């Protein structure tokens, strides 16, 4: 059995199920209508969104707050997708590098274009630190340009690598627990405990990675707004 088979995009009758997997997360965000009192889940979602918006939008200038809707929506999408991927017999779209790059590259490019449109001089000045010696100017400009172009790649690879590593560890320990259950039951109880702790850790990682992804985008936006 190949451990990486779980990361293959599922299909039905030759049709990819990647988009339905993403759209399924929106079901959890639908609020019931015609209710006098708010549902507890609605209250929890509202509190989570308010806290996330406060943390993400704090470093951004007031002029950049108009982009808060897309940042918060992206945070909710990534969080729910990562968490649902930890359930048995589910598919995690965010383990696909192609999808993460498709999200990171356009949003990073938007932050760069916003900076070039609103304050082109300041945006280009980021490529050359103040007080740089004359001989080092070409080298530093090249280094800063490369570091700028690497940002979307780092965003996509970071999210993919962390989620993929967690899923592989869970699968390896699950296989070990299942095999030890018939050969050494006492030892299988120990590995089961490790598996439960790892699952709790992965739930935290799923939330943290979504938050880090959006927070870095907000910092890029703040740098160019």
Swiss-Prot record:
InterPro entries assigned: ATP_synth_F0_asu, ATP_synth_F0_asu_AS, ATP_synth_F0_asu_bact/mt, F0_ATP_A_sf
Pfam families for the chain: ATP-synt_A
Localization of this protein: Mitochondrion inner membrane
TM regions (residue ranges): 10-30, 69-89, 96-116, 135-155, 168-188, 194-214
Catalytic activity of the protein: H(+)(in) = H(+)(out)
Function: Subunit a, of the mitochondrial membrane ATP synthase complex (F(1)F(0) ATP synthase or Complex V) that produces ATP from ADP in the presence of a proton gradient across the membrane which is generated by electron transport complexes of the respiratory chain. ATP synthase complex consist of a soluble F(1) head domain - the catalytic core - and a membrane F(1) domain - the membrane proton channel. These two domains are linked by a central stalk rotating inside the F(1) region and a stationary peripheral stalk.
Family membership: Belongs to the ATPase A chain family.
Subunit comment: Component of the ATP synthase complex composed at least of ATP5F1A/subunit alpha, ATP5F1B/subunit beta, ATP5MC1/subunit c (homooctomer), MT-ATP6/subunit a, MT-ATP8/subunit 8, ATP5ME/subunit e, ATP5MF/subunit f, ATP5MG/subunit g, ATP5MK/subunit k, ATP5MJ/subunit j, ATP5F1C/subunit gamma, ATP5F1D/subunit delta, ATP5F1E/subunit epsilon, ATP5PF/subunit F6, ATP5PB/subunit b, ATP5PD/subunit d, ATP5PO/subunit OSCP.
Protein name from the UniProt record: ATP synthase F(0) complex subunit a
Gene name as annotated: MT-ATP6
């Amino acid at each position: 059995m190949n451990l990486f088979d779980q990361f293959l995009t599922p299909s039905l009758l030759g049709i990819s199920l990647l988009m339905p997997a993403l759209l399924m997360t929106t079901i959890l965000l639908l609020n019931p209508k015609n209710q006098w009192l708010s549902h507890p889940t609605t209250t929890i979602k509202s509190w989570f969104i308010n806290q996330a918006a406060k943390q993400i939008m704090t470093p951004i200038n007031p002029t950049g707050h108009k982009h808060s809707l897309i940042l918060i929506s992206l945070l909710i999408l990534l969080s729910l997708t990562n968490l649902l991927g930890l359930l048995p017999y589910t598919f995690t779209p965010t383990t696909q590098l192609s999808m993460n790059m498709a999200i990171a590259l356009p949003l990073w490019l938007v932050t760069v274009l916003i900076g070039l449109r609103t304050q082109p001089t300041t945006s280009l000045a980021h490529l050359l630190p103040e007080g740089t010696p004359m001989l080092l100017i070409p080298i530093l400009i090249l280094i800063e340009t490369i570091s700028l172009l690497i940002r979307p790649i780092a965003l996509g690879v970071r999210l993919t690598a962390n989620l993929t590593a967690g899923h592989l560890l869970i699968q390896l320990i699950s296989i070990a627990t299942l095999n030890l259950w018939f050969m050494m039951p006492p030892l299988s109880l120990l590995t089961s405990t490790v598996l439960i702790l790892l699952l709790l850790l992965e739930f935290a990682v799923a939330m943290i990675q979504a938050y880090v992804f959006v927070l870095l985008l907000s910092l890029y936006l703040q740098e160019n707004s």
